[in-house]
């Protein structure tokens, strides 16, 4: 392999690692919903696969005649970005807003690797729906972003979204979730003193200063415009919006890493600023351990 290819490979691995570290840093700040790690290595779905007879056997799945064993020592995190603000009140059991951003991160502790899958909000998947009085009303195939609309509270909406992603992926288990509302993006941007990006699209329908090709340090409102805008854009596809969301993340994560390296108290400052916005089932101590391990992975 040439040096250029090796350097490119290292660059991609660093970028993936940086994004995951950023996700874990943000997730760490919630520290409010204690679930523990009782599922790890023990709870697996059986759809589209089978469990060999006998206690402790590894689940397998067959694809095109090839049998694969399920990896056991994994940490899986679903990052959910919603189209609601944290102070918006949901009315009823079917008004929880939509999941505009879905990013699944898989950490393989044996292989010491980190892999990501960003899921288009318009993907059709099984969604568990509720009736007017909160009763379970079966499952329907619809846009996966709509799964977040169903639930009695934020935790239940996250779980419903996670269940739809699991179903989309053939019943594979996802252990952890982090939900970030729309104004959480602005809060993160403010904490970092403004994230600097180069705009690849024209946003002047929402902000006359956000012209294509301009390098701009975002205000909180501009950060929300960048990650949310779609219908007002020349290219109004969700694929284009997904690219813009990654532009913001790719710019924000190195800033987070730099702040932490410069100031050991920055994590506490982040906790104070972001914890009111986040919903998660992650435990603070667990996140510290995951962060320390994943920092050295490819």
Where do the language-model regions lie?
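Non-catalytic, solvent-exposed segments at the cell envelope interface
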Residues: 2-25, 29-298
């Amino acid at each position: 392999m040439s040096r250029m290819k090796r350097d490119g490979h290292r660059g991609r691995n660093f970028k993936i690692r940086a994004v995951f570290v950023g996700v874990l840093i943000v997730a760490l700040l919630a520290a409010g919903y204690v679930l523990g790690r009782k599922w790890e290595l023990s709870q697996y779905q059986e759809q589209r696969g089978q469990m060999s007879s006998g206690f402790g056997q590894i689940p397998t799945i067959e694809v095109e005649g090839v049998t694969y064993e399920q990896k056991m020592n994994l940490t899986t995190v679903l990052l959910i970005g919603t189209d609601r603000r944290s102070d918006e009140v949901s009315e009823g059991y079917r008004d929880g807003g939509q999941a505009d951003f879905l990013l699944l991160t898989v950490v393989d502790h044996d292989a010491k690797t980190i892999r990501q899958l960003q899921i288009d909000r318009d993907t059709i998947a099984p969604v568990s729906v509720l009736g007017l009085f909160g009763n379970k009303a079966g499952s329907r195939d619809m846009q996966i972003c709509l799964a977040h609309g169903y639930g009695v509270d934020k935790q239940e909406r996250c779980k419903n979204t996670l269940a739809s992603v699991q179903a989309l992926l053939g019943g594979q288990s996802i252990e952890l979730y982090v939900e970030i509302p729309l104004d959480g993006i602005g809060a993160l941007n403010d904490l970092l003193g403004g994230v600097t990006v180069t705009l690849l699209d024209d946003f002047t329908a929402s902000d006359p200063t956000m012209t294509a090709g301009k390098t701009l340090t975002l205000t909180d409102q501009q950060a929300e415009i960048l990650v949310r805008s779609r219908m007002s854009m020349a290219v109004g596809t969700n694929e284009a919006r997904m690219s813009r969301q990654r532009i913001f993340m790719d710019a924000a994560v190195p800033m987070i890493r730099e702040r932490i390296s410069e100031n050991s108290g920055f994590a506490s400052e982040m906790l104070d600023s972001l914890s009111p916005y986040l919903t998660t089932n992650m435990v603070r101590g667990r996140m510290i351990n995951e962060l320390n391990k994943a920092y050295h992975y490819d």
